[in-house]
Amino acid sequence: MGKQQWKFLMEIIEMNQNILITSAGQRVSLVKAFQKEIKSLSKDNKVYTVDLNPILAPACHVSDGYRTVRRVTDPNYISELLVICKELDIKLIIPTIDTELLVLAEHKDLFLSEGIIPVVSDLEFVQACRDKRIINTFFEKHNIEIPKNLDKKNLSFPLFIKPYDGSLSKDTFLIENESELTEYHFQNEKLMFMEYIDHAKHDEYTVDTYYGRSGDVKCIVPRKRIFIRAGEINKGVTHKNEIVNYLKSRLSHIEGAVGCLTMQFFFNRETKRIIGIEINPRFGGGYPLSYFAGANYPKFLIEEYILKRELDYVEDWEENLLMLRYDDEVLVHHYEN
């Protein structure tokens, strides 16, 4: 390491390099991961959290401190968040829910002008990820197969219905036959009718990918969803299978994409057919499995955005690592409602 690099590193270590995780909720593992990595630079570095109701958010009590924020849809959300960032000397903002991504992407330059980096992809890409019609076009453009769209006047069964802007399995329907269809299905213009992907033949995978500042992929970790609870993985296992090279060849670069992107795919166990479902440009609830497997995205973010280092593509994470989740407790003493 040269003298200039050493001087820069010492300056970084001596300065507070605090991180803010928004809508922290139950993301205890994510908070702990960032704490471990940022405190390896200096024990004085902090990971703070914000939430609409932090006193009832376990991750807020695990963090180094928390603040209350109004709803992300409130017109004053951004100005309030900026004040909090200045008070806590925040360097990186890590958003965790879809609605935050849009707002932070729209106001990214405002935070950057204050020396605060929201780790969020460009607005155009965030908007595309929020609309399944657009992301389907994105998949097709990159030669990734998608479920077949069905004509509402010429349906075949079984079929699957979901909204183009939905999340957490809200308003999704598996339709076995015509008698199960209602006026609601046809009158709701947001609902998409599509091919049903048979779970008896396909495994569902969440893929934790990391994209560097230039939009180049740096890591790809497929994790099979064994059991889902409340829309989030409860049991899962990492696999180094065909999906890795499939995505590496097709999505080696995504313009405007940065940080952790959580992608959903179906994988046919016999034919090896891979079907793209969606992309969420943020940390997913099941990311801790990839972290424990060695895909250290919190460290990647710190290296890129704080230490200003270039990242190489890495694939030295642990395959066949099984994660089994269970409920744990965070106790708050002297609580008054």
Q: How would you name each of these model-derived features?
A:
Residues 123-201, 211-214, 241-245:
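Active-site nucleotide/adenylate-binding loops and adjacent lid/helix of ATP-dependent enzymes
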Residues 55-57, 124-128, 228:
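Short gly/pro/ser/thr-enriched loop/turn and capping motifs at secondary-structure boundaries
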Residues 2-119:
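ATP-binding N-terminal substructure of ATP-dependent carboxylate-amine bond-forming enzymes
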Residues 54, 165, 281:
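Short, glycine/acidic-enriched loop or turn micro-motifs at the edges of active sites
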Residues 175-257, 266-270, 274-275:
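Phosphate-binding site of ATP-dependent enzymes
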Residues 88, 242-337:
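ATP-dependent carboxylate activation and anion-phosphoryl transfer catalytic cores
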